[in-house]
């Protein structure tokens, strides 16, 4: 995750509520890390109202679609009784992947606020620009780099600890062999 980087942004269009929702997502991501999940979390909100929040749950549910964005949109849609999330915003700690970016468009999400860019799978700015692709039937307003340093450090710490644990397990196997 050393390639994670800060997005240069003026934060024009980012409101105080967006920062508060990102702080909430960061808190959820920390909890996910404690549960062995990659620390990514998302909050779906309309104005000041939180409609849904979720963290990655791929490991817990053995579900390849258990990304925070997908889970949060599913919960928001159920709460609203509607799959369209028009007028809603999402704060997510990492730039969405192609699957999640496509789901944002399909859900007609109004705005996306994300923290760190994703050099390996980022589909909003880094590798692709799915949410603002004029060829699609909906475009999502995007603001990247919100509290990016905190989001990056959370991911780096998680993977640093994971690598150390994997190395310790390998070393233990070598000693017992």
Short names for language-model regions:
Residues 17, 38-40:
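Short loop/turn microsegments at loop-to-beta-strand junctions
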Residues 94-101, 106:
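Conserved redox-active cysteine motifs that mediate thiol-disulfide chemistry
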Residues 1-32, 103-177:
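Zinc-dependent deaminase
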Residues 40-48:
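Short beta-strand scaffold segments in enzyme catalytic cores
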Residues 82-95:
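Immediate flanking context of iron-sulfur cluster ligation sites
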Residues 60-70:
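A short, polar/charged loop-to-alpha-helix boundary motif
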């Amino acid at each position: 995750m050393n390639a994670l980087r800060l997005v240069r942004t003026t934060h024009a269009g980012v409101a105080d509520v967006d920062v508060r929702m990102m702080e909430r997502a960061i808190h959820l991501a920390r909890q996910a890390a404690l549960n062995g999940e990659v620390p990514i979390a998302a909050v779906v909100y309309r104005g000041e109202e939180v409609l849904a929040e979720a963290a990655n749950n791929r490991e817990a549910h053995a579900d390849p679609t258990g990304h925070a964005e997908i889970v949060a949109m599913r919960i928001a849609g159920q709460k609203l009784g509607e799959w369209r999330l028009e007028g809603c915003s999402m704060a997510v700690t990492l730039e969405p992947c192609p699957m999640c970016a496509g789901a944002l468009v399909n859900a007609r999400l109004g705005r996306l606020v994300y923290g760190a860019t994703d050099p390996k799978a980022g589909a909003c700015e880094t590798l692709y620009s799915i949410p603002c692709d004029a060829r699609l039937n909906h475009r999502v307003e995007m603001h990247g780099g919100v509290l990016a340093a905190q989001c990056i450090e959370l991911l780096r710490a998680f993977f640093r600890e994971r690598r150390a644990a994997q190395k310790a397990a390998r070393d233990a196997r070598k000693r017992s062999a």
